[in-house]
Amino acid sequence: MNLKVTTHMVDLPEIPHHNLVGLGVVALAKGDTERFQAIMAAGTHHYGEGLMVVGDSISRHWLAACANPYAVEIAEIAAVAGMPGSFLMNLSYEWACTTSVTADPSGSGNRLLRTLDWPLQGLGRNVVVATMEGAAGVYENVTWPGFAGVVTAMAPGRFSAAINQPPMRKWSPSFWLDWGINRCRLWRRRALPPVHVLRQVFDTCRTYREAKKVLSETPLAMPAFFTLSGIEPREGCVIEREEDATHVREAPASVANHWVAAHIPGRCRGIDSLGRFTLMESLGEGVLDDFSWVRSPILNSTTRLAVVAN
């Protein structure tokens, strides 16, 4: 399996590649302090100092109440940061993405195409690829210093996967009332966030079939869309997840930031989710082995990252 990553369709510096085998994600925050501090500064600028402090405290207590397996790592990352925000940033879930999984035109396995959009400035400039290792083997994690979860990754000889965010559930005419209701629902749950479930999958699942089972059946703290791509031509799917319910679409399939397999009222995420989805669906298996597919509306003002994984 191969992994290609770019931060935009222009000439940019090469993305750093860190070997964290035997070291862990805390070592990345310690070893790449320039990028780590830049991301923390961007978070403070985006959320504001007050929300970073309050959100950090709430996030820390919730992780402790859930007995989250990565809470200790995040606490160590927070100590490295020396400022509030690491707990909040690790639970931030505001990105918009476009992803697809189809048979690779080379005839070898499946191919995952993926962009990540986020209003937080600096994510593209500060992205890294980290080689990590769990019980099931090594994997390449497209990540940022200070982040303990997995959003996009590829495990050679096993599978690749990515997370998209569903719409915010709509309960009322008011955006802020809906935001509050959804946050209250989250704080009452004692399940793992999707980014931590995906990390566990890369750490422990040895096959596409195992990964699909875990992503389909594990209770979640909040809804998520998982795209999973294996090494065989028929190993590909989009898993649309509610907290305790699952809707699977087999490959070829695409996903942006709206429900396709389920009909759940929600508030839109990102720029032109339907347009991004429609373009990705139309591309199918005809995409060249490059980033020419990253064009409007898949490419927009908040696009920070593009990935091709086979």
Please give the residue ranges for each predicted region.
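A contiguous strand-loop segment
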Residues: 12, 42-46, 50, 65-193, ...
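C-terminus-biased signal that marks the final domain/tail of proteins
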Residues: 1-105, 202-310
